[in-house]
């Protein structure tokens, strides 16, 4: 069935092959595409799980996000996203927060995610503070902007 499932005209097996590319941008694209395909790409779960060990942080984040969309949320994908909240690169922290926020208000590991996101409310980078605050708002199921956004004006 996977040969019939495609994203941008490319099949699941072809996107899985991209996860092994020597080019980290191609690996990230492969993870992104598999995440866009979602549950129909279940044959890619083990390959996405392997990509969680990629040497490039942004590939790990996109692989974790894809795994969370392809497989039921929780497990290793959430663990990787939470770990990447502590990355030295601001864009990786911001991206991890963004993806955690989109998992919804109930998933295994949400308590740890909420704790780490609250810690990021004081991050030195404004983009990280914004994404952490928005993720907190989504995960806590509040329609109003979270109070953490107030720290952005200081």
Predicted segments with their positions:
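Amphipathic alpha-helical scaffolding segments comprising HEAT/armadillo-like alpha-solenoid repeats
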Residues: 6-18, 39-53, 72-86, 107-121, ...
């Amino acid at each position: 069935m996977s040969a019939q499932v495609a994203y941008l005209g490319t099949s699941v097996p072809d996107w899985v092959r991209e996860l092994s590319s020597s080019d980290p941008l191609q690996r990230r694209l492969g993870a992104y595409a598999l995440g866009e395909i979602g549950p129909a790409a279940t044959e890619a779960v083990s390959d996405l799980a392997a990509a969680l060990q990629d040497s490039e942080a942004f590939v790990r984040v996109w692989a974790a996000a894809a795994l969370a969309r392809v497989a039921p949320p929780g497990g290793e994908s959430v663990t990787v996203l939470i770990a990447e909240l502590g990355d030295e690169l601001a864009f990786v922290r911001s991206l991890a927060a963004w993806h955690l926020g989109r998992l919804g208000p109930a998933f295994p590991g949400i308590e740890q995610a909420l704790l780490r996101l609250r810690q990021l409310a004081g991050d030195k980078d404004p983009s990280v503070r914004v994404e952490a605050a928005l993720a907190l708002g989504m995960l806590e199921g509040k329609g109003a902007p979270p109070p953490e956004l107030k720290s952005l004006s200081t």
